[in-house]
A protein has these predicted regions:
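N-terminal lobe of the biotin/lipoate ligase/transferase fold
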Residues: 2-163, 167, 243
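Structural motif
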Residues: 87-88, 112-114, 139, 178, ...
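Alpha/beta catalytic cores of group-transfer enzymes, especially the acyltransferase/condensing modules
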Residues: 179-183
Length: 332
């Protein structure tokens, strides 16, 4: 970041922390160690970017509102986390937030750094599937974590993330999301969110984890490609209204920080309980296909380690860590 942008970010931070009062040009000049005329020029540039700033003679400046578009500064204003999102890498257009997050993590990015984009051109889902990520219509976000966990536990972070997103969607939109094991969130049987967890690890320790999430927020049905139009949905389609993307991101980060702290202190039981509150098709018939066999079974929930719990072909409870699931089965 160049010196001018750094100064501008500090200026926004000062204004954002004092929205209920004016800050004199003299005070800003002293804190930022630049002239009052330079302060005035920065204010004019911020107004060009969409910031609404009120300036009054003998009183100073105060910020009235931030631009609608997402940026590092707009996200930090009103974000009340302790460590998550304190470093933000924001891009207007990007191939994938996962790619950038991996590179940032390899370069030493801190625990809690987030990568966010207005648009992804190569959005990444599970099993190398693509994830449709249009400009300014959704949340395309990756979180870098450096947890003190055994590598085999990293998959539990996917389930934790799913509970966080389900809680945010329910509490902020009043919609009724369900979590489809292991990583999708559905509303009325249509996908609104996908989660991808990747890591770099040694045999017994994790170097870093990158949790990526794509959330369809303000798309209309016609904005989806035809091949996914009947399977995908958005918060707007399901609720009939637009949603403030910045506000949703801030809630996600706040909820995630709390849930992650609880998980690191108490382990998986609270995640399991919350996950099963939102679990899709629990108690219902599903089709299961593994490399060895396929059968119909009742979905029982998730195990203490996050595995899918179902009945094997002989009616005995079994754990599945990887399987092809047919979710829409009908009992005969």
């Amino acid at each position: 970041m160049d010196k001018m942008q750094s100064t501008r970010n500090k200026l926004i931070e000062l204004l954002a922390d004092n929205t209920d009062q004016y800050i004199s040009g003299q005070m800003l000049s002293e804190k930022l160690k630049i002239s009052r005329s330079a302060i005035w020029k920065h204010m004019k540039e911020l107004e060009k970017d969409g910031y609404v700033i009120e300036g009054k003679s003998k009183k100073g400046y105060r910020i009235i509102s931030f631009p609608d578009k997402i940026s590092e500064n707009t996200l930090k204003w009103g974000l009340h986390t302790k460590w998550l999102g304190k470093t933000i890498i924001h891009k207007e257009t990007i191939d994938s937030t996962q790619f950038v997050a991996h590179q940032a993590a390899r370069d030493g990015a801190k625990h809690g750094t987030i990568v966010i984009a207005d648009e992804q051109t190569k959005g990444k889902g599970r099993m190398s599937r693509s994830f449709y990520s249009p400009s300014n219509e959704g949340i395309w976000l990756s979180i870098i974590l450096r947890p003190q966990l055994q590598p085999y536990l990293a998959a539990q972070l996917t389930l934790l993330t799913a509970t966080v997103l389900a809680e945010v969607i329910k509490n902020e939109t009043l919609l009724q999301p369900q979590i489809k094991w292991p990583n999708d969130i559905l509303i009325h049987d249509k996908k609104v969110t996908g989660i991808l967890t990747e890591m770099q690890a040694e045999q017994d320790s994790i170097e870093y984890v990158v949790i990526g999430m794509g959330i369809n927020v303000n798309q209309t049905k016609d904005s989806f490609p035809e091949d996914i139009r009947e399977k995908a949905s958005s918060l707007k389609i399901e609720s009939g209204q637009d949603w403030d993307i910045k506000n949703l991101i801030q809630h996600i980060l706040l909820y995630f920080e709390d849930a992650y702290a609880d998980y690191m202190e108490h382990g998986f039981p609270n995640v399991k309980k919350k996950w099963e509150e939102y679990g899709f098709k629990i108690g219902e018939l599903i089709g299961i296909k593994t490399l060895q066999k396929e059968w119909d079974s009742t979905f029982l929930g998730i195990a203490e380690d996050g595995a899918l719990l179902a009945e094997d072909p002989y009616g005995k409870e079994t754990k599945l860590y990887s399987a092809e699931i047919e979710w829409f089965k009908e009992r005969k």
